[in-house]
């Protein structure tokens, strides 16, 4: 066996990215050069989304449009996939090759928040009435809107926990373990 043989994928670079940068020792993670410790609990997920997608802080995710979920199968994944597929032709989305980068970004943001809205609506369950849009509109962040749409009156600690989780998991990246 050769002296330079290393089993597995140790040392193999599959690709390079500027979006997420874990340190080699696993002690820290940076999104676009910003340490995750400076984001979690300090910057809302909607604005972290802007950092990841746009490369800078700015207008994050817009509020979802008040479309009720049109499918209730009892399976959140099925409901969301079916509902999102209905929006593209309704909104007139065209193939990515036929639109500008700015239009693609706006469409991605619009679809992303609708996915969150549909997850919340489906997870709320068929037997529970929808939360009034006026209540959803009182929420200050994308995560709070999600939680209100799902739970009605969420515990602020739960909103903070979900926001922290979504921020920390927003860019998993692709590493040898995946």
Show where each model-derived region lies.
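Hydrophobic alpha-helical bundle cores within soluble ligand-binding/oligomerization subdomains
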Residues: 1-178
């Amino acid at each position: 066996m050769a002296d330079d043989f290393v089993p597995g994928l140790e040392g193999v670079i599959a690709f390079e990215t500027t979006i997420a940068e874990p340190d080699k020792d696993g002690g820290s993670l940076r999104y676009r050069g910003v340490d995750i410790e400076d984001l979690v609990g300090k910057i809302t997920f909607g604005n972290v989304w802007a950092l990841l997608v746009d490369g800078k802080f700015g207008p994050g995710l817009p509020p979802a449009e008040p479309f009720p979920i049109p499918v209730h199968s009892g399976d959140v994944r099925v409901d969301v996939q079916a509902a999102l597929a209905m929006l593209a032709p309704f909104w007139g989305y065209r193939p990515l090759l036929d639109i500008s980068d700015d239009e693609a970004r706006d469409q991605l943001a619009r679809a992303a928040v609708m996915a969150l809205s549909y997850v919340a609506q489906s997870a709320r369950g068929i037997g529970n009435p929808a939360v009034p849009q006026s209540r959803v509109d009182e929420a200050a962040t994308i995560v709070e809107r999600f939680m209100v749409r799902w739970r009605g009156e969420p515990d602020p600690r739960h909103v903070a926990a979900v926001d922290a989780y979504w921020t920390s998991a927003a860019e998993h990246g692709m590493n040898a373990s995946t």
